[in-house]
């Protein structure tokens, strides 16, 4: 029987209708966060898609020292708390160190382990101690079967509810590719699988001082992942991605999201028909 992770009234499982995890790459301020959350909540409610809001208070692995990192943990969590209370939607956000886990868990329903940190045992253990759902992004440098080791660590630390996210694999320099087999391979671990359609089109460090990307392939990869049969679709979204402070080339334009989600719902239904 496939593992199902329950979050409030949301059920997350590879055999269930997909859940959308979406929001801007980083928190840019209260007004912007509330604007984006309102748009996404209304859209997902209209389309009857379960929704979890995602945004980061700190982009700790920016390519350049001059890259804008975000509003910081104190202000960021305050804003995410406002989003959560105003729109009654669950929250997922990144943690980068053990010291951030307890404070972040006071607001976030899901703690996300960044791909670059997915093997950091102390961070996994600190996240586990919060009792929250732990969502781990598979490192670009890892084979999908290597996530068994991450699962074993988390289970040893007492985590019952785990989500794994595929976000592409290194392919030469400044490039990622998505191997759709990895979704099925990780699903064999009996963990709900999420596909990160926007970071999968990244070109890490491809712009020299920042990360590049090609958002025209987001829809293509999202369709392919849905056809495999997954628990969740992860997309970073912005009303004006070309002027966003981080990951602009990868993020979906808010105005284009509805048409893509309508298609994904159709594909998801076909994939999961009994």
Curated annotation (Swiss-Prot):
It catalyses: D-arabinose 5-phosphate + phosphoenolpyruvate + H2O = 3-deoxy-alpha-D-manno-2-octulosonate-8-phosphate + phosphate. Its EC number is 2.5.1.55. The keyword Cytoplasm applies. This is 2-dehydro-3-deoxyphosphooctonate aldolase. One of its GO terms (cellular component) is cytoplasm. InterPro entries: Aldolase_TIM, DAHP1/KDSA, KDO8P_synthase. The lineage of its organism: Bacteria, Pseudomonadati, Pseudomonadota, Alphaproteobacteria, Rickettsiales. Belongs to the KdsA family. Keywords: Cytoplasm, Lipopolysaccharide biosynthesis, Transferase.
């Amino acid at each position: 029987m496939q593992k199902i992770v329950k979050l409030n009234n949301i059920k997350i499982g590879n055999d269930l209708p997909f859940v959308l995890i979406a929001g801007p790459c980083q928190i840019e301020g209260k007004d912007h966060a509330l604007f984006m959350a309102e748009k996404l909540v209304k859209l997902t409610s209209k389309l009857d898609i379960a929704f979890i809001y995602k945004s980061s208070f700190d982009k700790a692995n920016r390519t350049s020292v001059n890259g804008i990192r975000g509003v910081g943990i104190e202000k960021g969590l305050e804003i995410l708390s406002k989003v959560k209370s105003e729109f009654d939607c669950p929250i997922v956000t990144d943690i980068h160190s053990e010291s951030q886990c307890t404070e972040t868990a006071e607001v976030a329903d899901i703690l996300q382990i960044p791909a670059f940190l997915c093997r950091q045992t102390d961070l996994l253990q600190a996240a586990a101690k919060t009792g929250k759902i732990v969502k781990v992004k598979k490192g670009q440098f890892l084979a999908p079967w290597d996530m068994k080791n991450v699962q074993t660590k988390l289970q040893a630390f007492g985590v019952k509810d785990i989500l794994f996210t595929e976000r592409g694999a290194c392919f030469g320099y400044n490039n990622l590719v998505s191997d759709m087999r990895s979704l099925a391979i990780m699903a064999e671990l009996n963990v709900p699988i999420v596909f990160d359609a926007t970071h999968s089109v990244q070109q890490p460090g491809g712009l020299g001082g920042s990360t590049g990307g090609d958002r025209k392939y987001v829809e293509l990869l999202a369709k392919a992942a849905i056809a495999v049969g997954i628990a969740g679709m992860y997309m970073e979204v912005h009303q004006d991605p070309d002027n966003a402070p981080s990951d602009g080339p990868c993020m979906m334009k808010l105005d284009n999201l509805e048409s893509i989600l309508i298609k994904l719902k159709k594909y998801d239904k076909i994939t999961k028909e009994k």
